[in-house]
Design a protein with these regions (language model features):
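TPR-adjacent "capping" and linker segments in tetratricopeptide-repeat scaffold/adaptor proteins
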Residues: 1-12, 37-47
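Gram-negative and organellar
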Residues: 1-2, 19-24, 28-31, 42, ...
């Protein structure tokens, strides 16, 4: 029988008992040993002390406090996989299912024993069979330096000269959604999804916009596969751009179509996501834009461990229109890397390239008043870079602010459609 006096006199023995108790989530053992360990450690930011207090807080049903401590611990040391597992379970108990599932998916990439994998799978199944409503929302601060995508002032060719100036706009974008799953039979379910988004600029309101999409369909999901079939309707509104600072919204377009998604875990580290969308777009005033839209997107995700992932993707977008000058095909590729660093720092880096080819020219061949590039179908080379930075230790009400630098460059066969711009965005989002 080991006494408290022996543990106080022998810190090595105390650690040999305390660390396994933390890993096993042995609530009684942690409760007995934590008070002894606290007497030896005067540093409140000691990792083992934080871990022990997180376990005790969860035992006392103080889930918000427990989650906060676990997040702090995993932020300091992302390699503590058993602390991450306990964080995921606490998130599940606090009904933060999306955040919990994200942590469980990261843990699957680690070299864990079969018993732990079984625990992860059981919690993942419970989340997949939830019938509760889920909600999400986000807001992003915007400070656009070239919202009208203007070319550089003074670009000229064939006696034509660019006179438009880049317009700035400050405001925010917003998004909100609600989703309800209803289990039908075993892994089959029906799904109802509402999603709305928009942009609001307080100093250049003619660029404001609102859109909403409603999806009703069904799906199948197990531990490795998910299939969704979701017919939808979508509406969008914007102000009259010919009226400066107009704040009255008018119906701009509507679409009816179908989404299909297939998500498949190839193994514990590789996941492939394929989405296909078919729709018919109709415009309220600009009827020349009416037409079908087809898009295909495929993304391959590799989670190397619980604090690092890589991804790549290819996309194809086909837009039909009555006016061939507005119909185009767009092929794109993208790749990126996400990393959780020590001390709570996280980063995400993405680069992309796209080729856009229009089906028709803007002007007729016999029009001698315009440059030659207006008489040929436009072709664009489109480049993008996104870098996102955030600190997992800095959050409030479950929201972690993220800052993104975005760079976009368009090289077009039509010189007046070539431009580049870079912006910073500040994002706040939450699932609940």
């Amino acid at each position: 029988m080991i006494t408290e006096a022996q543990l106080v006199e022998d810190p090595t023995l105390l650690l040999r008992l305390f660390i396994p108790a933390l890993i096993r989530n042995d609530v009684e053992g942690v409760g007995l040993l934590l008070s002894i360990y606290e007497k030896q450690k005067k540093q409140e930011d000691d990792e083992l002390l934080i871990w022990g207090n997180a376990i005790i807080a969860r035992k006392n049903k103080q889930l918000d406090k427990s989650i906060s401590l676990y997040r702090s611990l995993v932020s300091r040391n992302p390699k503590l996989v058993f602390a991450r597992l306990q964080l995921a379970i606490a998130l599940f108990e606090n009904k933060e299912n999306e955040a919990a599932l994200e942590q469980f998916d990261k843990l699957k990439s680690e070299n864990l024993n079969d018993n732990v994998i079984d625990i992860i799978n059981k919690y993942s199944e419970l989340i997949n069979h939830q019938n509760d409503w889920s909600f999400n929302g986000g807001i992003v601060y915007l400070n656009e330096s070239n919202i009208n995508n203007s070319p550089k002032l003074g670009v000229n060719t064939a006696n034509w000269k660019s006179t438009s100036k880049p317009e700035s706009a400050e405001g925010f974008s917003y998004v909100g959604g609600a989703e309800k799953k209803l289990s039908i039979y075993k892994n089959y379910f029906s799904l109802l999804n509402f999603r709305g988004k928009g942009k609001y600029y307080w100093d250049n309101s003619k660029y404001n916009e609102i859109s909403s999409r409603v999806k009703v369909g069904f799906g199948y999901k197990d531990l490795t596969n998910e299939v969704l079939f979701l017919p939808f309707v979508e509406y969008s509104w914007n102000p009259n751009k010919n009226q400066q600072n107009s704040s009255t919204f008018h119906r701009y377009s509507n679409a009816i179509g179908t989404e299909a998604e297939i998500n498949n875990w190839l193994n514990k580290q590789w996941k492939n996501s394929l989405s296909v969308e078919l729709s018919r777009q109709s415009y309220h005033k600009t009827k020349l834009l009416d037409g079908n839209v087809y898009s295909v997107s495929d993304t391959l995700l590799y989670i190397s461990n619980s604090n690092q992932y890589w991804f790549s993707g290819i996309d194809f977008y086909h837009k039909e229109a009555k006016s061939k000058a507005n119909a185009f095909d767009r092929f794109s590729v993208r790749a990126g890397w996400g990393q959780e660093w020590l001390q709570g720092i996280s980063t995400r880096f993405q680069v992309g390239y796209a080729k856009r080819i229009y089906q028709g020219a803007i002007a007729e061949e016999n029009n001698y008043w315009v440059p030659d590039f207006y008489k040929k179908p436009q072709k664009n080379d489109e480049y993008s870079v996104y870098i996102t930075l955030w600190n997992r230790n800095f959050y409030f009400y479950g929201i972690t602010p993220k800052i993104t630098w975005a760079y976009q460059k368009i090289d077009s066969s039509n010189l007046f459609y070539s431009y580049d711009k870079n912006n910073f965005y500040l994002e706040f989002s939450k699932y609940f």
